A protein has these predicted regions:
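Charge-dense, helix-prone N-terminal extensions
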Residues: 4-163
Length: 163
C-alpha cells in the first residue's frame, strides 16, 4: 500500500500503522513484531523514553508475550526483575497502555502517593476494583506526567538499581 509523501512528486510506502489496523490484527500469534515495529506503531517519543528508563533503572531486557486476554489481546511487552512483574505494556496508535499491578505490600504506599499524581492516574486508581488486596491499573500513557507516575508506581513494586 502506498501513500503520497510530503514532497509533491514523491510517493512513499504506507506502513502498517498508517493503515489504521488494530494491533492484534496486524501481528497475529505466529507473527511477532520487532521492537522497531512496536516503536513505529506507537509513534510517540514517550515510548522510547519509557523503555530506556525501565531498562536502565532495573538493568533488564523486556520480552514479548502473546495474550488472548479479552481486555487487551495481542502482543505485549513485559518487564520483569528477579521474577517479579514490573509492568506489561500494550502498544496503541499514538500511545501505549501500561498495566501495573499494585500488590498488597505496595497498596498503602500507593494510596499515600496518589495526591501527588495526575488527576487521570488518581481516577484510574480510585475506580480500580481491589481484589486479593491488589489493584490492576491499566494506564494510558499519553503524556510525560502519566509516564512519570507509572514509573513511580513501578518503583513501589521493585526499587530501581542505583547507578
Amino acid at each position: 500500500v502506498w501513500k503520497f509523501g510530503s514532497s509533491p512528486y514523491r510517493w512513499k510506502k504506507k506502513s502498517r500503522r498508517d493503515i489504521g489496523m488494530d494491533w492484534n490484527i496486524l501481528y497475529t500469534n505466529g507473527d511477532a513484531p520487532s521492537l522497531k515495529q512496536i516503536a513505529e506503531y506507537i509513534d510517540n517519543p514517550l515510548w522510547a523514553e519509557f523503555d530506556s528508563r525501565i531498562r536502565s533503572a532495573y538493568r533488564i531486557e523486556p520480552y514479548m508475550d502473546y495474550s488472548r486476554c479479552s481486555m487487551q489481546p495481542g502482543w505485549n511487552i513485559k518487564y520483569k526483575k528477579s521474577g517479579k512483574s514490573l509492568c506489561t505494556c500494550y502498544p496503541m496508535q499514538g500511545y501505549f497502555i501500561a498495566l501495573v499491578v499494585i500488590g498488597s505490600r505496595e497498596l498503602t504506599e500507593a494510596e499515600l502517593l496518589m495526591p501527588l499524581f495526575s488527576d487521570y492516574v488518581q481516577k484510574v486508581f480510585r475506580d480500580a476494583k481491589t481484589g486479593n488486596r491488589q489493584k490492576w491499573l491499566m494506564l494510558e500513557v499519553r503524556d510525560k506526567e502519566i509516564m512519570n507516575n507509572v514509573i513511580e508506581l513501578i518503583n513501589l513494586r521493585k526499587r530501581s538499581i542505583s547507578p
